[in-house]
Amino acid sequence: MSAAEIDEGVFETTATIDNGSFGTRTIRFETGRLALQAAGAVVAYLDDDNMLLSATTASKNPKEHFDFFPLTVDVEERMYAAGRIPGSFFRREGRPSTDAILTCRLIDRPLRPSFVDGLRNEIQIVVTILSLDPGDLYDVLAINAASASTQLGGLPFSGPIGGVRVALIDGTWVGFPTVDQIERAVFDMVVAGRIVEGDVAIMMVEAEATENVVELVEGGAQAPTESVVAAGLEAAKPFIAALCTAQQELADAAGKSGKPTVDFPVFPDYGEDVYYSVSSVATDELAAALTIGGKAERDQRIDEIKTQVVQRLADTYEGREKEVGAALRALTKKLVRQRILTDHFRIDGRGITDIRALSAEVAVVPRAHGSALFERGETQILGVTTLDMIKMAQQIDSLGPETSKRYMHHYNFPPFSTGETGRVGSPKRREIGHGALAERALVPVLPSVEEFPYAIRQVSEALGSNGSTSMGSVCASTLALLNAGVPLKAPVAGIAMGLVSDDIQVEGAVDGVVERRFVTLTDILGAEDAFGDMDFKVAGTKDFVTALQLDTKLDGIPSQVLAGALEQAKDARLTILEVMAEAIDRPDEMSPYAPRVTTIKVPVDKIGEVIGPKGKVINAITEETGAQISIEDDGTVFVGATDGPSAQAAIDKINAIANPQLPTVGERFLGTVVKTTDFGAFVSLLPGRDGLVHISKLGKGKRIAKVEDVVNVGDKLRVEIADIDKRGKISLILVADEDSTAAATDAATVTS
């Protein structure tokens, strides 16, 4: 539908997502009511309960000294959106959650390349979550809201950009699925793009298989193979087109109301005269340098050439040294791409489908529960696995549906990994994003908590970087998890693909007709990532894709090219999996330093007895046995210890309380005196089960004046149950020495 003016100066448009038997979703955009002082502001609604405000602003003056585009995207989660008060000490929102940071990246990735090159004004997009249905996700709605507000801001922006989540449920791709629907899906994909010449150009993809994919596929669901994923990208296009159309109609209506379009100055990285001079003096030497295989040696030689070129052109372009450096980078990009497109050879001499030398090794960190070192060329990743009790799962306080996370994947990228200096400390957005990608790749193959009752922390240390440390992290993590004894459903490997393209003259054409030429690269280097047209990361098992991430600088990639890239990635993935299998092909025995966690069930009405007043009972069991104990609300008890006897002792004590075997007359025990009184001694038979030896029974037929003359607290006595009264009180007698050896048993073991 076209835009409607619902109030003076207030316009709205809607886009309807028709999912057939899965229902429809309505996305509504409104402008002119809120945040009127922003350059562009849009309120986006998903059905009735989900409401976001996106505001885009631009600085008045450009930052001419910047050599990059200063775009900032912030997502503000407001807890009132879900009717909650923040759980922090000050009861207000603090640093952004992981969900918010990942949404910022989802917005930034398709929007950043859509701004004109050379823009140096600071642009800020702030998305505020105002209302959220717990059954929905807000990230994709935020992409559309951010695009719409930017489109309204009068900025040099080639939008609008539409974003949609599609999930494969019962063989159908469903747009804007609910959280419940995603749980029934085998694959979940966020796709963003814009309309170019009547078709949708895909600019960004973030996708993963769901947690239940293996079980669903075994039950007959369609596996997310490469061809299925490619079909999902095509299925997303009509939804994206509808969203882009609605945004454009809103911008057209708001523009007619008199909002001026602003002209922003553009600062090219270099002038044509500078590029001509640099190419004339540096082409031959630079082309030779780009044949050096080693990254460090190649970079050193290019730096030497740059210094020589800057010195040589210093007088001609005084004060324009930055332009000379930028022109040299542009020339480098041109030469790299020419060699790939024309000769099908790459910087390091590989062919377009060749993978760098691979190496895999496990058990490299002595006391770690699991560890591995994975190397692909100069990319080197150390993976380390730590296992702990389920109670160590991460607790999440955000607007997302997830409240705890049992598997945590943390990615670190220290500056020395690229031979540089820099800040170390808290993770940056890039590190959080890479860790999340590796996590999504592995979650589908993790065992359930019933099969493996542990919290798992996986850390990926990027010790060397020259192309796709995130996919290297997937490989290293698979190896480390297997080394830790985690029974993965299947090993997972990942590979980064690239794409280089240009326009060539069609042979025999007389009117200058050109066609697009594409070359897909396997296992891209860092330079190929920077100079190429696509960064395409694919992770999966030998049978299906578990995670996928795509960013492209082109106005769309033909579906057949994308399908070919997926198949090329599968070939590489299978090769890597073979190398990994040589290092480890099944779960190892668990490390002696890892806790042994056992699961038992107790009746819900017995939980209080196991815990005891103020935790007295459970703390006593922990202290006596050295085991860690965690109790869930449903009566599931996790008992963990680094040695089996400690765990078993704790289990026996818990069972004695929660699942007691009532003693009977005639049973014998080796008990501990826990209390003495004037009339006798109380002996502990089982946890929570004591009996009394009357003073008259302590003297073995002789009269004694004081209990302490015979026994004291802590003494061991061999006793027999003589009587149990109606109230359950147990009377004991001492077992004669001649009978004790054959008859008495340990207090933890009852003999009938």
Swiss-Prot record:
Domain spans labelled S1 motif: 666-735
One MF annotation (Gene Ontology) recorded for this entry: 3'-5'-RNA exonuclease activity
Pfam families per UniProt: KH_1, PNPase, RNase_PH, S1
Protein EC: 2.7.7.8
Domain KH: 595-654
Cell location: Cytoplasm
Coiled coil start-end: none
Transmembrane segments: none
GO process annotations (BP): mRNA catabolic process; RNA catabolic process; RNA processing
Reactions catalysed: RNA(n+1) + phosphate = RNA(n) + a ribonucleoside 5'-diphosphate
Residues binding Mg(2+), per UniProt: D529, D535
A cellular component annotation (GO) from this entry: cytosol
UniProt KW keywords: Cytoplasm, Magnesium, Metal-binding, Nucleotidyltransferase, RNA-binding, Transferase
Cofactor(s) needed: Mg(2+)
Biological role: Involved in mRNA degradation. Catalyzes the phosphorolysis of single-stranded polyribonucleotides processively in the 3'- to 5'-direction.
Protein family: Belongs to the polyribonucleotide nucleotidyltransferase family.
Name of the protein: Polyribonucleotide nucleotidyltransferase
Organism: Mycobacterium tuberculosis (strain ATCC 25618 / H37Rv)
